[in-house]
UniProtKB/Swiss-Prot annotation:
Top-rank taxon, per record: Bacteria
Similarity annotation: Belongs to the YqgF nuclease family.
Source organism (scientific name): Salmonella typhi
Protein name: Putative pre-16S rRNA nuclease
Record keywords, A-Z: Cytoplasm, Hydrolase, Nuclease, Ribosome biogenesis
Cellular compartment(s): Cytoplasm
Encoding gene, per UniProt annotation: yqgF
Known function: Could be a nuclease involved in processing of the 5'-end of pre-16S rRNA.
Cellular component terms (Gene Ontology): cytosol
CDD domains from the UniProt entry: YqgF (cd16964)
Molecular function, one GO term: nuclease activity
Matches recorded under NCBIfam families: RNAse_H_YqgF
Major enzyme class: hydrolase
UniProt EC number: 3.1.-.-
HAMAP family named among the record's database cross-references: Nuclease_YqgF (MF_00651)
Length: 138
């Protein structure tokens, strides 16, 4: 069973990032990565992988509330496949429904409107995705 996991909240302009430990079931945000129409700076992804050496990558899978796919779903899958193809690391897709809503709510409670900048919301969403993955017993 892997110990260190890196999570991504895929977006077309910003990709949230979180690091977590399976043994504690906790995660913390890392700085978000800017993207150009969903394409990240792959050298930044490579640096993250070298620095944290995760055993597994979790990518949030955006779904509609009824579980059906939306336009962003295919792009998140493509992002996950590219990470696996480029770096050979295990990548798992995980349902991310309501993670952004929960992230915004938590950030607002702690810091009001000033805390709601895009990068912070995206990385807070990545934390929620990873903690949800841990809670489901993975």
């Amino acid at each position: 069973m892997s110990d260190t996991l890196l999570a991504f909240d895929f977006g077309t302009k910003s990709i949230g990032v979180a690091i977590g430990q399976r043994i504690t079931g906790t995660a913390r945000p890392l700085p978000a990565i800017k993207a150009q129409d969903g394409t990240p700076d792959w050298t930044l992804i490579e640096r993250l992988l070298k620095e944290w050496q995760p055993d597994e990558i979790i990518v949030g899978l955006p779904l509609n509330m009824d579980g059906t796919e939306q336009p962003l779903t295919a792009r998140a899958r493509k992002f996950a496949n590219r990470i696996h193809g480029r770096f050979g690391v295990t990548v798992t897709l995980h349902d991310e429904r309501l993670s952004t809503v929960e992230a915004r709510s938590g950030l607002f409670e702690r810091g009001g409107y000033r805390a709601l900048n895009k990068g912070k919301v995206d990385s807070a969403s990545a934390v929620i995705i990873l903690e949800s993955y841990f809670e489901q017993g993975y």
